[in-house]
Amino acid sequence: MRNYNWQHQQLMSRQMQSTPLVICVLDKFASGGGLLRTYAGQDVSFALQVKYSFAGHLGEGGEDLRNWVESNGNFSCVLTGPTTLQADVVYQGAGTFVFFYKPVLAGKYLVSVRLGSGDVPGSPFESYVEPGATDTAACSASGLGLLCAEAGVEATFNIISRDHYKNQRTCGGDNYEVALTGPVCFNASITDCNNGRYIAKYNCIMCGDYYVNLRRDGVPITGSPFVLSVVAGKTHGPRNKFPKSS
């Protein structure tokens, strides 16, 4: 029995010096957004739990694990994509390391989680940051039809829905209204392109200066009202109503 205990202690000692297993817990620790998909401006957190290959449950030998991680260069997390972000790392005990970051630019990122100079299993991860909710103050309008037009000729301009961080929305559904006031008053028609872009169209038959009032859900976007000048169209001479002489 004494010999067995000695052998067991020797085995445990060798295992304590072996490489632990690193287990990624994706999204299950998320306080807001998830690691693989989230929204601009959302706080994201995810956890890694580390245990020795001989441990019966997560967190066994937590302080030893922490010391092992520190001796191997510690964990780090860097996101590369539309911009580069460095996540904060906090040790919460029992072999659990939590990563925190907040992306504000929408797009595709690669999330590289490293221990020292080497990636943990599964890293780098693909992460998609979607635009946040539409922010009326960040929406914009542009195009020649917002500045000038020719009487009797259809004119157009674009409306772009954006979130608080200026990311263009990737879907439609926003409620815009374009009202023109001047020598005559009328509304423009709006086409939803279902990608965050909207096309406003109108055909003004009377020359003059107009205010273009552009609202989303009743709230003016930045720059509204815009000043529009409608000029006379091309001159057309009278048609010849006299029969040709023989």
Identify the meaning behind each predicted range.
Residues M1-N5, G41, G56, G93-F97, ...:
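Short tyrosine-centred short linear motifs in exposed loops/low-complexity segments
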Residues Y4, Q9-E63, K108, G116-H164, ...:
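Short S/T/G/P-enriched beta-strand
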Residues Y4, S71-F75, G107-Y109, G172-Y176, ...:
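Short beta-strand/loop motifs in extracellular/secreted proteins, especially
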Residues L35, Q86-V89, F100, L146, ...:
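Beta-strand-rich interaction surfaces with strong enrichment in secreted/lumenal proteins
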Residues V50, Y101-P103, I159-S161, Y202-C204:
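Hydrophobic beta-strand positions in extracellular immunoglobulin-like domains
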Residues G56-L79, Q168-V178:
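Calcium-regulated, polybasic anionic-phospholipid
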Residues G73-D88, N175-S189:
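Short amphipathic beta-strand segments in non-cytosolic proteins
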